[in-house]
């Protein structure tokens, strides 16, 4: 666990998804709570609950494992998460330069003056901000 709580959150979700774990436990901060709410709303997570141990709060998230059926059999889709703006190199954009992830199939999470939101919400509100991560 480092100082970058967003990278810790994304890495925990990515590792749990690769190891086919059902749940992920991450430290609860305002930023991680907002990102997890967006992931829940967009359908990348199944459920989230807040858990307290001693004096610390944790978010326990249940991952959504989607299985697709093809002619060759059933395969599990993976969730890809990529950290864009990091503490050593911040990436900012205006609303016209907000990237579309996979041509609109994925989402970009932005930190704006009106809070943390997806790329679609930021385009509708016509505001830019710091590009935190891509999820597809």
UniProtKB/Swiss-Prot annotation:
Keyword hit for Ribosomal protein: yes
GO cellular component, one term: ribosome
Subcellular location: Plastid, Chloroplast
Superkingdom, taxonomy of origin: Eukaryota
InterPro entries: Ribosomal_uS8, Ribosomal_uS8_CS, Ribosomal_uS8_sf
Family: Belongs to the universal ribosomal protein uS8 family.
Subunit structure: Part of the 30S ribosomal subunit.
Stated name of the protein: Small ribosomal subunit protein uS8c
Organism this protein belongs to: Hordeum vulgare (Barley)
């Amino acid at each position: 666990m480092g100082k970058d709580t967003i990278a810790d959150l994304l890495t925990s979700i990515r590792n749990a998804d690769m190891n086919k774990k059902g749940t992920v436990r991450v430290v609860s901060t305002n930023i991680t709570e907002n990102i997890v709410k967006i992931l829940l709303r967009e359908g990348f997570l199944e459920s989230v609950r807040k858990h307290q141990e001693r004096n610390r709060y944790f978010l326990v998230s249940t991952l959504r494992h989607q299985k697709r059926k093809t002619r060759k059999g059933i395969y599990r889709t993976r969730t890809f998460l990529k950290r864009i703006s990091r503490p050593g190199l911040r990436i900012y954009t205006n609303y016209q330069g907000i990237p579309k992830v996979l041509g609109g199939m994925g989402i970009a999470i932005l930190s704006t003056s009106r809070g943390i939101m997806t790329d679609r919400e930021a385009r509708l509100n016509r505001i830019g901000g710091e590009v935190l991560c891509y999820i597809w």
